[in-house]
């Protein structure tokens, strides 16, 4: 009898220990590691390809690179490193997942599946503020994380505000403090923000500063053009009728040259394919400015328009004079140039492009979807 009791007691102790270990492992937890001085600064640059890495970096103030994984965001520096470096700061949460990451100035704002918004100083790794918002979808960044840091779902920035959409409404939070500025009962799934300070939803636009509806705005739904990462700061749009508009000011300006479905806007000019060339024209009058080699417009860097040609040559042009100010092939250590561009980011100093295989499967999680293990190529501008 004594042995039976002893065995039962031992079994209870083992079970209790297992429960304790399981609770300690699986309980909700957060881990924050901050930067040890000296804090990162923006390095000097000269135009060339710097390296290739397996993850999509979000360049923050051209000082650090931020990466997203399922349950963690982390940063490395300097931003022109040819490989992913040891993290200078990191923030991990369990069991929540990273839904999206954006940056405004030096502040990195992450949105998590439980609805938490967490703002971290990009150069120190310290939490600046946090706010509770509506729950969000889980991690959808696949292998590189590009969808999470360059195209997050329902997370946008505009000036001093970060905007969150969920449950048929949109809310604006102050980037510096996390204070909720306003909430509008406007369905805005995957809307976009304009360079002129509006957030554009399928049914119309609201002012980022106040949350009030914009009285005079073309009818939607809309197609954004000339946007930065996170579908933010868009320089133009096409309305439901396919008419083009410039959106860099307080009021949209009609731009007939932007009516073409293959046209975009950069540095105040409209660009579209013309035969074997890329043509720039005045957005309002349509007067031709310059022709360039056939290329895709990636964005604007310190006033220069950045292009990627079909043979994967990177160009930066002065849109006013038409002069090419830099040119080099987007290859590292003799890699082939047989890849398709996926997503990308252009800043004043850097460009990063996700490279996809030419004959790839539809599923990003299927082997052979990306061009190589180090799918993202980096360059200085």
Question: Locations of the language-model features?
Answer:
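Secretory-pathway ectodomains
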Residues: 2-381
């Amino acid at each position: 009898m004594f042995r039976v009791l002893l065995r039962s007691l031992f079994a209870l102790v083992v079970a209790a220990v297992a429960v304790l270990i399981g609770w300690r492992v699986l309980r909700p937890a957060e881990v924050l590691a901050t930067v040890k001085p000296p804090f990162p600064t923006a390095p000097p640059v000269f135009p060339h390809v710097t390296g290739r890495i397996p993850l999509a970096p979000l360049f923050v103030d051209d000082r650090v690179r931020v990466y997203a994984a399922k349950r963690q965001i982390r940063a490395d520096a300097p931003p022109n490193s040819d490989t992913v470096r040891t993290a200078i700061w990191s923030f991990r949460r369990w069991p929540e997942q990273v839904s999206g990451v954006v940056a405004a100035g030096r502040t990195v704002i992450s949105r998590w599946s439980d609805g938490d918004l967490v703002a971290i100083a990009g150069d120190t790794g310290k939490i600046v503020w946090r706010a509770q918002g509506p729950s969000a979808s889980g991690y959808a960044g696949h292998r590189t994380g590009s969808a999470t840091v360059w195209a997050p779902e329902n997370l946008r920035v505009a000036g001093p505000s970060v905007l969150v959409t969920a449950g048929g409404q949109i809310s604006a939070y102050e980037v510096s403090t996390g204070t909720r500025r306003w909430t509008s009962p406007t369905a805005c799934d995957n809307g976009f923000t304009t360079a002129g300070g509006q957030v554009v939803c399928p049914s119309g636009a609201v002012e980022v500063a106040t949350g009030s509806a914009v009285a005079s705005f073309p009818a939607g739904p809309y197609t954004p053009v000339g946007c930065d990462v996170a579908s933010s700061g868009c320089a133009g749009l096409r309305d439901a009728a396919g008419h083009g508009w410039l959106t860099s000011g307080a009021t949209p300006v009609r731009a007939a040259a932007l009516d073409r479905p293959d046209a975009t806007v950069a540095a105040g000019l409209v660009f579209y394919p013309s035969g074997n060339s890329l043509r720039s024209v005045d957005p309002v009058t349509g007067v031709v400015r310059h022709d360039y080699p056939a290329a895709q417009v990636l964005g604007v860097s310190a006033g220069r328009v950045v292009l990627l040609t079909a043979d994967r040559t990177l160009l930066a042009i002065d849109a006013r004079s038409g002069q090419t100010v830099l040119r080099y092939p987007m290859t590292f250590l003799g890699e082939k140039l047989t890849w398709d561009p996926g997503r990308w980011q252009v800043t004043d100093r850097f460009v990063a492009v996700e490279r996809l295989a030419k004959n790839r499967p539809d599923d990003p999680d299927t082997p052979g979807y990306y061009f190589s293990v180090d799918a993202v190529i980096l360059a200085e501008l």
